[in-house]
């Protein structure tokens, strides 16, 4: 499982190093895609296929389904980890997530989120409390 928060630096070639604690979770490749709230998401290829099925079950006759699938999957990339366990982040995703040099990697149990540090700090500052969100979600399934 993927847990924790890691502060990383994006190098000159748009790569981040996968923290040692997380390396055993991944094989030699990952899928990186556009996420919500201006972050990126990293998954194992098999987990990405399961993620895709969630959206593929929505009716393709609805415009919102087609739009959501395009926005997420058109920019998804299968990326090989290099020998130093670095992930190359494609330029289009760097732009989408507004990534600068300082990056925050956040474990989300089954995937990782990649955030620009300033964007993530702004997100946290404007977020509601844990209790408020949990209360509102009590009936969600």
Swiss-Prot record:
Stored InterPro entries: MraZ (IPR003444), MraZ_C (IPR035644), MraZ_dom (IPR020603), MraZ_sf (IPR038619), SpoVT-AbrB_dom (IPR007159), SpoVT-AbrB_sf (IPR037914)
Transmembrane regions: none
Phenotype upon gene inactivation: Probably essential, it was not disrupted in a global transposon mutagenesis study.
BP-aspect Gene Ontology terms: negative regulation of DNA-templated transcription initiation
Superkingdom of origin organism: Bacteria
Keywords attached to this entry: Cytoplasm, DNA-binding, Repeat, Transcription, Transcription regulation
Subcellular location: Cytoplasm, Nucleoid
Residues of the SpoVT-AbrB domain: 5-47, 76-119
Gene Ontology molecular function terms on file: DNA-binding transcription factor activity; transcription cis-regulatory region binding
One GO term describing the cellular component: cytoplasm
Protein family according to the UniProt entry: Belongs to the MraZ family.
Stored PANTHER family: TRANSCRIPTIONAL REGULATOR MRAZ
Assembly notes: Forms oligomers.
Record HAMAP family: MraZ (MF_01008)
Protein name per UniProt: Transcriptional regulator MraZ
Organism: Mycoplasma genitalium (strain ATCC 33530 / DSM 19775 / NCTC 10195 / G37) (Mycoplasmoides genitalium)
Species classification: Bacteria, Bacillati, Mycoplasmatota, Mycoplasmoidales, Mycoplasmoidaceae
